[in-house]
Each structure stands twice: as structure tokens, then as C-alpha cells.
Design a protein with these regions (language model features):
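Nucleotide-activated chemistry modules centered on ATP-dependent adenylation/adenylyltransferase
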Residues: 2-209
Length: 209
């Protein structure tokens, strides 16, 4: 049975592009939907090398070419993801409008291709921490893209948790072992928010992260 919120519909010659970080959620969506385009964006995040290593492994496993783009946004971020813990901003992860920027980059990258939708790896609960994890954000960005004739924005797993998404997709644990969620560098630190979430999910699935 398909879980609510996990879209599988596609028709005709339409193509889908997934913003792909090599993390658990985007990996599970990639494994399930096999979108035609997997877009990895190095926007200056300090974990880009680790994310890219994971993304390449997973793209190869599902027989998809990884499209790698670089856009320097580090000067606009602070906190662990930007490698700047000295900022006066007290939020550990502060990169204002980051997801809006990445979605816009995806729309720009594929403006000359018949891309029907851009997929993002938002899951249930993301909106409890960040406004860009809400259905309202997805709907608003979708309208904005549509104003310029762009593709639709979809969050196919926004109604399910990471664990529900994994169970429904039946992605192998071995593939999940390739995923990378650290915010602080090329190798998992084990203590940042990304690593803690990754480890919690893997432990619930019966395998240490």
C-alpha cells in the first residue's frame, strides 16, 4: 500500500528532478521514484564533500547520472553548516532562505528541459523546526515558480515520517548505509543535528548508523 503523501504518478514525456543531498530522506525518495534528474548542489556547505560521495554512490546504485552544480552561498550562512560557529547568531544552523535558493537554482538549471516537477525531500515533522518544511512553504514556492512558467514543486513525502517512507519504499539498509547527513564536515561527527537524526533513524531500523 502506498503511504499518503508519497507520490508515484508520472505520465508521458514528463521529467522530474530531485534536489539530492545524499541524505536519508532524499535517498529514499530517489530509490522509490527514480527521477530522471538527480541534482546535487554544492552551495558552500562544509559537508559538501561527504554529501557528494554519498550522492554519487546512490546515483550509481539506481542507474542515474548525478548532475553536480556549484553556487557559492557560504557568505550568506552561519553556524555549523557554513563552518562558522563564531557568529553572533545563536542558532547553530542559520542559512536564511537556503532552500528557496536551492529550489530556484534547480528551476534555473533545467529551464531549457521538459522538467514537470522539482522534488524535495521534506518529511513529516520538518515543519516543526523550519518554515520551509511546511506544506504552506511548498504551496507558496509552487505558485512562485508557476508565475514564471516553471515546473511544479513537489514534496512527495511531506505527509510521512522518515521511518514510514523507508518502510514503504523498502530501500535496502545497505543503501541507507551510504547516506550522509553530517552538517560539520566531510566525515560524520556523530554529534550535530544531522548525525543525531541519522543515527536515531538507523537505530530504529535495527542498524547502528
Amino acid at each position: 500500500m502506498t503511504s499518503p503523501g508519497v507520490s508515484t504518478i508520472q505520465s508521458g514525456n514528463e521529467m522530474r528532478a530531485l534536489l539530492f543531498s545524499g541524505g536519508i530522506d532524499s535517498t529514499t525518495i530517489a530509490w522509490r521514484l527514480k527521477p530522471e534528474k538527480l541534482l546535487f548542489v554544492d552551495y558552500g556547505q562544509v559537508a559538501a564533500t561527504g554529501e557528494l560521495r554519498a550522492a554519487r554512490s546512490i546515483a550509481k546504485a539506481i542507474d542515474r547520472e548525478l548532475d553536480i552544480r556549484s553556487v557559492s552561498l557560504r557568505q550568506f550562512g552561519s553556524g555549523s553548516m557554513a563552518g562558522d560557529l563564531s557568529s553572533s547568531n545563536t542558532v547553530l544552523e542559520f542559512w536564511p532562505y537556503r532552500n528557496q535558493a536551492l529550489i530556484t537554482v534547480a528551476a534555473m538549471a533545467y529551464a531549457d528541459l521538459p522538467i514537470s516537477s522539482i522534488l524535495i525531500g521534506t518529511v513529516s515533522g520538518d515543519g516543526d523546526r523550519h518554515a520551509d518544511g511546511t506544506a504552506e512553504f511548498v504551496e507558496t514556492m509552487n505558485r512562485l515558480l508557476g508565475m514564471q512558467g516553471g515546473p511544479m514543486l513537489e514534496a512527495p513525502a511531506i505527509e510521512v515520517t522518515s521511518e514510514q517512507l523507508i518502510a514503504d519504499t523498502r530501500v535496502p539498509l545497505s543503501a541507507l548505509g551510504w547516506t550522509f547527513s553530517c552538517h560539520t564536515g566531510e566525515w560524520a561527527c556523530g554529534t550535530c543535528a544531522g548525525c543525531l537524526k541519522h543515527d536515531q533513524i538507523m537505530q530504529r531500523l535495527g542498524q547502528e548508523g
